[in-house]
């Protein structure tokens, strides 16, 4: 009930991305999860916060030939908000994953904030190597299989050149499907996912100190720029899913 929600100046929300994600079934507003946006609109209509920040996946820009985006913009504008949206990439904000997400930044019209432009981020580049734990417990993350194939040429650092700003695939597990691809720690990581199968589900696999392994939950926290004192869920499956669903902290703080 919207009346039970305390008054607030800023509403932050993310209607579930699975309804619009390329990796999902892309049912959009036909998915009950996608209709959560209209619950957000209902809360906005009741409380009239000064500012709104909403987040969703890149695919929402073109979902249903642009009709989904048009509905979102028209709904927010109809509630008397000036609406701006930006496609932001995680690797531009000091984390080693591209993770492109759309952010809707809205100002109540009576505040008279017009022509809003988000300034350019100024973060140092990070590779996966920069977020690794020093002595992690490998019991739950190391992948030991006899169908691992590594391309030795691709792990030679002299060959990397300017490819550090994207994931560098250096091998596969089994047939190399989703969750079965191996990457170098000297590039960015793949986008963390809340779902997916394969030996390296949710994080991807990396060659680290001669071993093939997934990222630890703490490394996933760092991939999302969570602080070191953030308490991680003890249930590791839940923790991986939470980080796959999370928003990059640095981006929200920057906005």
Show the residue positions of the predicted features.
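A short acidic, often aromatic-flanked loop/helix-cap motif at beta-alpha or helix-coil junctions
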Residues: 1-2, 90-95
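Short, surface-exposed amphipathic charged segments that create phosphate/polyanion-binding patches used
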Residues: 7-8, 98-103
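A secondary-structure boundary/capping signal
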Residues: 16, 56-57, 89, 107
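Short catalytic/ligand-binding loop motif for oxyanion handling, primarily in non-cytosolic enzymes
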Residues: 18-22, 60-63, 94-97, 111-114, ...
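Core alpha/beta nucleotide-donor-binding catalytic domains of modification enzymes
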Residues: 1-51, 58-70, 77
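Residues at alpha-helix caps and immediate loop-helix transition turns in enzyme cores, especially N-
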Residues: 64-68, 100, 251
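S-adenosyl-L-methionine-dependent DNA methyltransferase catalytic core
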Residues: 75-79, 101-255
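Conserved S-adenosyl-L-methionine
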Residues: 58, 80-92
């Amino acid at each position: 009930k919207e009346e039970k929600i305390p008054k607030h100046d800023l509403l932050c929300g993310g209607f579930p991305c699975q309804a619009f994600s390329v990796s999902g079934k892309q049912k959009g507003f036909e998915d009950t999860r996608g209709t959560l946006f209209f619950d957000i609109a209902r809360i906005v209509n009741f409380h009239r916060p000064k500012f709104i920040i909403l987040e969703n996946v890149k695919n929402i820009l073109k979902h249903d030939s642009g009709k989904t985006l048009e509905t979102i913009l028209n709904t927010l504008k109809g509630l008397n908000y000036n609406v701006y949206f930006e496609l932001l990439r995680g690797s531009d904000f000091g984390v080693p994953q591209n993770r492109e997400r759309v952010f809707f930044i809205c100002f109540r019209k009576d505040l008279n904030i017009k022509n809003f432009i988000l300034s350019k981020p100024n973060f140092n580049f990070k590779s996966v190597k920069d977020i690794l734990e020093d002595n992690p417990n490998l019991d739950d993350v190391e992948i030991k299989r006899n169908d691992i194939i590594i391309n030795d040429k691709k792990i030679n650092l002299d060959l990397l050149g300017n490819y550090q700003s994207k994931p560098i695939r250096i091998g596969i597990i089994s047939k190399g499907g989703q969750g079965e691809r191996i990457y170098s720690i000297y590039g960015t990581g793949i986008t963390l996912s809340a779902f997916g199968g394969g030996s390296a589900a949710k994080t991807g696999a990396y060659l680290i100190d001669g071993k093939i392994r997934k990222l630890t939950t703490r490394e996933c926290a760092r991939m999302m720029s969570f602080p070191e004192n953030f308490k991680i869920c003890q249930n590791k499956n839940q923790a991986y899913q939470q980080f796959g669903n999370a928003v990059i902290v640095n981006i929200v703080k920057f906005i």
